[in-house]
Amino acid sequence: MGIFDVISGLFKKKPKIAYAKSQSVDLIELKRNPYYIVASVELGNTTTKSIITATNMDTGKTYIVSKHVKMTRDVRKPKKGEEVFGETLWGVELTREAVADMVKEVLLESLKKAGLTVDDLHFVVRSTGVTAGFASPEEVGEMIIALAQGCMKAGVPPAKMTPAMTKEQIPKPFDKYSFLDKIIFDGAVTGVLPPTGKEVVANEMEGELVTAGIKVGSKWTDVDFRNPCMSIDFGTTLAGRITNDTLPYAKVIGNLCGLAGAIADAIARGSGKIDEKTGAALDLANIKGKPNEELAKEYAEEMHKYIIIKEVPKDVDRFGTVPVDPKSAEKAGTTLIGCDVGKNGSDLIKLEELGRELVEKSDIPTLMCCLDYVMSEVVRRLVELAYKKGLISEKSAVGITGRAGITGRKPELIIEKLKTLEIWDKVEENVVFVEDGLALGASVMARCMNCLGTPQVPIGGVRGGGCILGLRRKWQKERGMIRD
């Protein structure tokens, strides 16, 4: 390498990254302005969390008030007489009562941190990423019931978990922001109609929430993340949606499922520094040092030989451990894109072995660097497949959330890798990274259910377009849903 290469390398501009960091708000400000306060309670494969969000109804901006996170592996063991209805990806058994106890604890703790009480909450949205341990998408309903019981044990009345039917049922001063006297809640969230018919993938709700969350989170950046778009949630399992740009409502034309953070966790377990069954990449995040980048790249390439990214075959009922229904997806006009390692995670052990080998040759920082390369390549392959299938185009925005997609150097590497696909002239203007996407999505879901809109900063509709309230009224009138 010559001296000029070194100099040009020093001055090479890093890509501009649209990264929506969670913004906070204090208690005094909360009391002063019309903030709609929502608790998002989520039980995931790796973490269980309660995140309190607050949306300023004048500006449409959503803030994180507080959060409390616990490792799901710490859920209490089933007591005598309790029925195990499922387990996490890592084999942690779950009963309705144990889940309810954990949910109660995280919810009350998040309220305590915020200096709030249950009475201060306007709505509670509950969701789960633990779908791999269930036999069918329907069984996820059992988990949702367990989450509801936990919320009620914490003192949340059922009315704060179900949408209002009339404007009069909306608490003051939020009734003036509600459009329930003009339209009804028809199931559309942020201008996207849910797929009709049978559920096509067990993590459908997660996909809906993260799409909505990235839409609201992107308001902190210059990227207009509305329809058409592709949302990618890198929790332990993969979730996400691809939408088209029809008006007033976009349709879901693609769903993502399979393994995501579980890939990083398997590699991390090879380090020998964390629990060999339930350890997560999160457990290694604080180990600093200079990595051997070339070695990290080399191993990332080797690991991708075991990572399968493809359209989910029609003859399976599980892909990447997640229950799916490809025939229903076909009927609904939805393409299922999945990520797996072997068959339903059968080759995760191979990734663990490669992780072990890499650490023996180098160190933990090199392993963490390898994770960045592995996960950024997963994004590139997902986006490339969606593009080849005609599900996204240069008009589409891509949004990424979840621990395995936005930490470390992943955003920078993802931007660089997406440039190689040559879909967009300016990748940076079409890709956004959002913290706490699922919790932000819960805040939007609560507002959509109660028709609480901010027409001046729309989150429905198409990129570059305006508010779709008028179009929605026309659409609902044509179908006899509302009358003048």
UniProtKB/Swiss-Prot annotation:
A Pfam family annotated for this chain is DUF2114
> What does the similarity note say?
To M.thermoautotrophicum MTH1153.
What's the protein here called?
A: Uncharacterized protein MJ1451
Organism encoding this protein: Methanocaldococcus jannaschii (strain ATCC 43067 / DSM 2661 / JAL-1 / JCM 10045 / NBRC 100440)
